[in-house]
């Protein structure tokens, strides 16, 4: 058998073996059999030493052509095997596009966030500026700048989280008011609300939390009167609780305001007739307020004979509890999805 016949037979056998290889492993074995260092094609190259010199170039060219042919067939077969494997995998993992998709849970705004944003939008519409402040505050701005010197007995009204002797977690957002007035350097007007978290050493129960949200408001200008405060609070009550709400002012005491009042709104559930929400009084307490104490104005650099003002503070937690019928303030902070899911329907309806 001549060398040409041997190469032709080898080529035919290689093509048969390649076509019979059904996976990558079998194809690799065929490649080693023919093109490996000890393979059939490599053996042909070794025979070249026995040929006359004038025949070696032509023989070497034919062997290389055979190698290229086998390699080309191997590449094509490998490509085909990959395609068959992919098609089989796709067939096994067929997705029925007619089936309904998996339900994806969509969140909604927290009831406290909704309430705070509603209050902020209300006061923005009245021309107020929203001002943020520090939650870790100096004792001076938390107490002394608000007419509460170190010896003042009213400090006992608020148990505080002290970090050092002069640094504490703020017990109200009033320090933001003091700092804002100080920055204005005695020049009015000042018209701000201060939303934020506050901290007090209360034992957590259905109506108390060591951390809660507060929004305080401050207006300072010339000729600000108690009637301005009352008119503002009436508008706020009607916007938050309904147009038919009424308010009443009860005398109270706050060191930073004089006079000071507690503000009640007529019960929106019983219309003032008496029920469990208002404890059968017909009224619900919603905030504290008063005219800014002259000492507070003076300490902030305002002339109390020229300027006057009013301040108020409300708890969005309590307002949200009243609006949504929530009986335990702790529900706001436990992140219970079952509780929060109830407010999706409210948001979908676009209700406040």
Curated annotation (Swiss-Prot):
The keyword Cell membrane does not apply. Its main location: cytoplasm. SUPFAM superfamilies: Class II aaRS and biotin synthetases, tRNA-binding arm. One of its GO terms (biological process) is phenylalanyl-tRNA aminoacylation. GO terms for molecular function: ATP binding; catalytic activity, acting on a protein; magnesium ion binding; phenylalanine-tRNA ligase activity; transferase activity; tRNA binding. Pfam families: Phe_tRNA-synt_N, tRNA-synt_2d. InterPro entries: aa-tRNA-synth_II (IPR006195), aa-tRNA-synth_II/BPL/LPL (IPR045864), Phe-tRNA-synth_IIc_asu (IPR004529), Phe-tRNA_ligase_II_N (IPR004188), Phe_tRNA_ligase_alpha1_bac (IPR022911), Phenylalanyl-tRNA_Synthase (IPR002319), tRNA-bd_arm (IPR010978). It catalyses: tRNA(Phe) + L-phenylalanine + ATP = L-phenylalanyl-tRNA(Phe) + AMP + diphosphate + H(+). Keywords: Aminoacyl-tRNA synthetase, ATP-binding, Cytoplasm, Ligase, Magnesium, Metal-binding, Nucleotide-binding, Protein biosynthesis. Gene3D superfamilies: Bira Bifunctional Protein, Domain 2. Binds 2 magnesium ions per tetramer. It is found in: Cytoplasm. GO terms for cellular component: cytoplasm. Mg(2+) binds at residue 258. Its EC number is 6.1.1.20. HAMAP family: Phe_tRNA_synth_alpha1. Tetramer of two alpha and two beta subunits. Belongs to the class-II aminoacyl-tRNA synthetase family. Phe-tRNA synthetase alpha subunit type 1 subfamily. This is Phenylalanine--tRNA ligase alpha subunit. It comes from Staphylococcus epidermidis (strain ATCC 35984 / DSM 28319 / BCRC 17069 / CCUG 31568 / BM 3577 / RP62A). The lineage of its organism: Bacteria, Bacillati, Bacillota, Bacilli, Bacillales.
